[in-house]
């Protein structure tokens, strides 16, 4: 398994499964930025250092660890752990956490339902851990 390809497939999968969840955007005073949009999905990092707040809402995919478990005479079996970081914005103390939970649960549900991504190239290993 190539972690780069996995992150690319995860990005496509998560973008398509969350595109209908429209969330508030933190806008600068006097700007003509859109006030709502779906969460953007990024791999490994945000485009700019100060984007932690400016790009909200977003989902960030980070490769954590990888394991090669190939035994003699068996097909190659690699695995890796990916952390999925969710960020949302809300001026309301209840709406923000609920929007965050909704986004997390949508991704979790769609991953479990699919079982694999990338045309079956990447299989999900249970259990999923989320906090």
Task: Place the predicted regions along the sequence by residue.
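Oligomerization/assembly interface segments of phage tail-like spikes and tubes
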Residues: 76-92, 105-107
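Small/polar-rich, solvent-exposed N-terminal microdomains that initiate assembly or binding
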Residues: 1-74
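Generic secondary-structure microfeatures
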Residues: 62-67, 84-90, 111
